[in-house]
Amino acid sequence: KKLQAAQDAREDKDFVIIARCYAMLVNGLDDVLDRCNAYVEAGADMLFCEVRESMDEIEAVAREFKDKVPLHWNHSPSPMVPRLSAKQVEALGFKTCCFYIQSLMAAAKTMQEVLAEIRESGTSEGVVDRMIGFDELWEINDMSSIRDMEQKYAV
């Protein structure tokens, strides 16, 4: 019913409805295959199936669905998940691959290092090489357009 609701609400033909299945850890491979087949039959444009435990399960899902709908792979840094490169994921038949949390984890580690340096030395001078410059930070965050809006709508 949720897929039908999404299809009924879709106004843009390019809007992609991705069916997500997290049942592997709880119910196992057979249930995942049944659920994903139901999603495909219900009209899902893409499948995002969390497969974490083994290459056999990953290959089974890919084999079953890669020719039916595009598959999405969520690349997890978890030690529970086989460490696959984007090329390996593509070779299995997945069409999209998301490295969803790696940059946040790297940023958190750098924040810890910077804050430890500040705590120990009272300055950030020892970690300046790990930081981007102010101009780059402003550009990344498109601060010039925000400044333009501030000036346009200032009271």
Question: Over which residues does each language-model region extend?
Answer:
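Alpha/beta enzyme core
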Residues: 1-75, 79-99, 106-109, 115-116, ...
